[in-house]
Amino acid sequence: MGKENAVSGNSIPIHGRPVTRALASALRASSKLITSSEVAATTQNQGRVLRAKSKRTALDEKKANAPKKRAVLKDITNVTCENSYTSCFSVAVENIKQIKKGRQSSSSSKVASSSATSQVTDAKVEVVSNSAGASLSVFTDTSLGTNETSYSIIAKPSSRSPPRPFGTVERSCGGASSPKFVDIDSDDKDPLLCSLYAPDIYYNLRVAELKRRPFPDFMEKTQRDVTETMRGILVDWLVEVSEEYTLVPDTLYLTVYLIDWFLHGNYVERQRLQLLGITCMLIASKYEEIHAPRIEEFCFITDNTYTRDQVLEMESQVLKHFSFQIYTPTSKTFLRRFLRAAQVSFPNQSLEMEFLANYLTELTLMDYPFLKFLPSIIAASAVFLAKWTLNQSSHPWNPTLEHYTTYKASDLKASVHALQDLQLNTKGCSLNSIRMKYRQDKFKSVAVFSSGELPDKLFIS
């Protein structure tokens, strides 16, 4: 009894239970008496094993409950070209992110240039950032043997000051000699304008427009059966379709972008070009419209040339090519913002200028060479030319437009001249859907307006 009491007095839990008298007797009978240190070591090791197992079990349960990852199918046609073009803008995006996070040194009083140049095949992007928080992205396309250059100046939005009455004049910079501009975001009464977040929203849109832009020479490099003329005929027909079904303008702009981006990376036969057009309009309608037209309606407008199954199959191919990320800022996206900035120079809202700017911007959808310009540049150029068309007695550009577009007049010279050629139809284009549309009285018949000669002094900053 004394020995048993001695053992039981130093009882140590084994496998989660204490060493009782009965257990001690059983261990002694089987000659498997263990010491306290051995039991402690055994218990510690078992505890580690149990903890490891419990972690692994929890991890397995977590994995079991998590949804399974599915491989995204992607069309790999011309994937080298796509990856090259994506990497072409990677430098711009990274520099913009650094600007937004405020990584530049605030002690620098001069322009601190952190420039990065990335050259892929025939294209080059150069990003120059300065201490004021502005970023200039320069896209040079030398593939066509020209020195065409697109500029994208992205200014970091400053923190919003307390609300002021609409029309309050601010200074764009801290210097006394800086030009003044009107704060169009000071009107906080209309919640749809998102005045508080508008600078950040359009800053992000300016970053997004640099991504997934089709090369302006994909017709020559990717397509062998589809031509520039066929693309123009398709867009001209889609303008009529959008009018027939009273679709919003954003649907048309997004449709044309989807067509160009798909043609940029995939070879398409001419017999399937119209199928691609109605499919892209179907996808854009689902994204932009409240009540999108049904597939059968799109088949009907092609005189039942294509079946429902063919449209669904093409829709699947397009969505896979885009990895289901179909949205991009278009010229219409920026035109709304720039028109609001342009209207402050008028005592009353000018509907003629609004319709004329929309007309000029839509004309660029049919013109394949305009792919070399950024959407924001096209929108700014449309406002510039619209103001010049309506009033040639004053300069069409002012500090307010320069502030909100981030473009100087000198940056728009090439695009404005190209847009004026479209307006005057110097090439004698026979596609008239957009011109007939804007000759209607509801659009103030702005298609009949013509602009005078553009003197070089307009583009001197």
UniProtKB/Swiss-Prot annotation:
Belongs to the cyclin family. Cyclin AB subfamily. GO terms for molecular function: cyclin-dependent protein serine/threonine kinase regulator activity. InterPro entries: Cyclin, Cyclin-like_dom, Cyclin-like_sf, Cyclin_A/B-like, Cyclin_C-dom, Cyclin_N. Pfam families: Cyclin_C, Cyclin_N. Gene3D superfamilies: Cyclin-like. GO terms for biological process: cell division; mitotic cell cycle phase transition; regulation of G2/M transition of mitotic cell cycle; stomatal complex development. GO terms for cellular component: nucleus. The keyword Cell division applies. It comes from Arabidopsis thaliana (Mouse-ear cress). This is Cyclin-A2-4. Keywords: Cell cycle, Cell division, Cyclin.
